[in-house]
Amino acid sequence: MDTIKKQKGSDDLKARALKLADLAQFQPGAIVSREILRKKTGTVTVFAFDEAEELSEHTAPFDALAFGLEGQADITISGKIHRLRAGDMIIMPADEPHAVKAVGRFKMALIMIRT
């Protein structure tokens, strides 16, 4: 679908021990994102995908690491599908087309380092 709803920022998260998966909540028919950190050198964002929600194919100018937090999703990179489950990670290379489709409800952390 590509409709992403943004939740509140990260100021309330500093110097606290928290469960990463709890930082973005599911919403029916939506993808929810919450930016945890934003610096000139990169970002950390948590996503919560409702069942069957997807980010359509796109590219990014930097490598990005996706870390499964809950559920599972199919991550397509340059036409090849990879099943990402809670506890798994995958690196999406810079400038390669990629997409994310939830298989059931799915949460992930996305870490992008700008270099």
Residue ranges with predicted function:
Residues 94-115:
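Ligand-binding loop in jelly-roll beta-barrel domains
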Residues 1-41:
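A short, N-terminal "cap"/entry segment at the start of jelly-roll beta-barrel domains
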